[in-house]
């Protein structure tokens, strides 16, 4: 054979001239078919098969194929990558009887010649799924002179293939285009080790001698578990391999043991400058001490042999009977060879010295070599003129004048074992009292090709998907047996699993610590985060994510199995205390014994509240729905207290069908500010005109009208005409659109500025009640109702000036000249202001903003954040300040509890005493129960004209709910003025 070839190409070419089916059944990548090749002349030669595997260093020329160059004393493999620019790589060519001649073998990492399984058209296997790409390459070279067939394995342990795998991981090819996380990346590398073990199993099944190459001078202990894994895998798949070669023309013992003999394993270590022998410091260089019998390299060799043998005996990789072992080592021969390192560590300097030596050839030498050399002769001349040795370049033996035993060369080391094979003596490596002879067979080239092809089909090149064929079935069974390797190879995962399994109970304890019997999702997540912190402190390795997911599942199962608290929150932001339950249906009774139980929500929180008019108080449960909060509680008290009082009812939904449907949760957004400004510019308001919306507009008949909330702050201020001190009744502007409320769909919540158009709720959350005539309120004693803190039950006076004109001033125009003997009206009124005005020019109303806390304590406020406190016979402060300001919806209660948590009181009622006078008091409540973008809530009838001579009570909603959920009361450290009743709640209009 003139050059190295891919083992797959070699077996394909041999199968062609043997008349059997090709392993892959496809032409070679080199471009020609193997079927046309003649029979090689060495087909009947008895051959010795030597397999080479191991790791390579990062240094130049440390690849394993340099070893074959040294042993064969010729340039079989190229010294450097891409030596010839037009080299197509190893392929099969029929020239001078060669089965596979290569013009120059390419680097093992390249894809030419069937280099990588699953990466090219011709591959060493067909496992091409994402993450299972095999980076192992088997190359073959037959030396006809020495009758030795070299099989060279380049795998993930070599730099070129390792670099390809790392690039695949980095680019995402191994993960289907995505970057793999730690656990999947670890699984990728372990899978590559398993595929490498299949290639090693093949070498251990077809070779007589195996060379393990290592780039350092210390033994890698990980080979111990690799060999134990291979031994276990071989015992597992041995029946399958027997089936594969049962028809091959080999001996009975070969068919029985699936190998020509127990292979002998030899070790090659590289020094790489690590071993340096220097004379002692005090020794005279002229009179050195007597040298020892063995050189330092020989002593290192013996030490490594003893260490390796002891390790393999302890782990029972080597036993007394060699026939039962994966491999053997000789008892009376050297099986470790130390390859000396180069004196020149700098690869660039080494190349420059090589170039310089070739450029300075002497004349006598040029006569000996008259023409340019190439091929093997060129390699020998390079060796003779080389000043520096390559990594595997070994000098010939020579005598030593110092008396030390001379170290043999690499070829001499290997050939003492090869000769035992070629002479058919075999290996007698069994030890002990009763050693059993091991089988041995020296096959011919043709017989070896026959057996090697069958094993190659099922172990490496077989297609697992082809289950219909015997080869595909055997391949499937062999690949399923790879799981045997996990206990040996995946030590990291095994350690990680043990570590994570020990961390799980600690994480479970951290999760269950200080837990109530039932708890919410928020508590579950907090406890799970604490458990994950404890778990991450102790868990390590690739199994971390797997057991973290198991921790998630375990904690969720514990929580959902009888410990799950109802997630529903009341309208006051309190959790339901029941465990997970369902609500009773219409007409169904609660059943606590069912699974899940049928119960109403209950937070076990109770408060005290007053009825619509405020005269009667009663305890109330914490509400969970808007109807119970704003309607049901007050309806129960209505029967006992307020039922006989006069009411102003707000419009509600009146169905026209027996089964009305709630409206969908689609909010009508408020218009932008620019549109609202344009609307104001187009329709200027006259003095005293109402800024509130009529009932038709409040039902959503105009989108622009909904954008006016909150009211324009410029409309307020200190102008008394705006807030009702004196206003002249003018003609109202007409509605934009006349539209009736829907009688098919109802509003499921409360009416607010973002509600859909034309919808009404089924019940009103507001109430307007008349307690009695205006004289029923005593200015000196205040309101006589339950729950008021002493001194806070008074209403504030509101003096409204009624403009009355005398008969002689009726036709007077302020813009015209005054008549003779008539005074200017402005001046006359200024003169008469002090004493001449009549008593009916001023009407006195009374206003009170009542706040109520959860304990039923009530008090009035005379302004924002100012609790009323009357010490004498009535309040002296006017109601103008409160009417001209945004009143807070919540305020700190005047009587705080003992706890640190602040106690809030809520604005619940507005008391208005309307005098019997020629004026109208219009009620326009607007509440914003939260910071923006919280909408503005208002009653179903926005402008309510209060009849004269009455004491009226407007009861505000207890809770505010939108389609997105309830507007909860404020928490600690929250600006209370973000929760407010907008200014302009009352307006007086003179008649």
Curated annotation (Swiss-Prot):
PANTHER family: AMPLIFIED IN BREAST CANCER 2-RELATED, NONSENSE-MEDIATED MRNA DECAY FACTOR SMG8. The gene is SMG8. It is linked to Alzahrani-Kuwahara syndrome: An autosomal recessive disorder characterized by severe global developmental delay, impaired intellectual function, poor or absent speech, microcephaly, and facial dysmorphism. Additional variable features include early-onset cataracts, hypotonia, lower limb spasticity, and congenital heart malformations. GO terms for biological process: nuclear-transcribed mRNA catabolic process, nonsense-mediated decay; regulation of protein kinase activity. Residues 95-110 have a biased composition (Low complexity). Residues 290-299 have a biased composition (Basic residues). Component of the SMG1C complex composed of SMG1, SMG8 and SMG9; the recruitment of SMG8 to SMG1 N-terminus induces a large conformational change in the SMG1 C-terminal head domain containing the catalytic domain. Forms heterodimers with SMG9; this assembly form may represent a SMG1C intermediate form. Keywords: Cataract, Disease variant, Intellectual disability, Methylation, Nonsense-mediated mRNA decay, Phosphoprotein. Transmembrane segments: none annotated. Involved in nonsense-mediated decay (NMD) of mRNAs containing premature stop codons. Is recruited by release factors to stalled ribosomes together with SMG1 and SMG9 (forming the SMG1C protein kinase complex) and, in the SMG1C complex, is required to mediate the recruitment of SMG1 to the ribosome:SURF complex and to suppress SMG1 kinase activity until the ribosome:SURF complex locates the exon junction complex (EJC). Acts as a regulator of kinase activity. The modification Omega-N-methylarginine is found at residue 898. Belongs to the SMG8 family. The lineage of its organism: Eukaryota, Metazoa, Chordata, Craniata, Vertebrata. Phosphorylated by SMG1. Residues 685-706 have a biased composition (Polar residues). One of its GO terms (cellular component) is cytosol. Residues 279-289, 675-684 have a biased composition (Basic and acidic residues). Residues 16-41, 82-127, 279-299, 653-722 are annotated as: Disordered. The modification Phosphoserine is found at residues 115, 469, 668, 742, 895. This is Nonsense-mediated mRNA decay factor SMG8. It holds the Pfam family Smg8_Smg9. InterPro entries: SMG8-like.
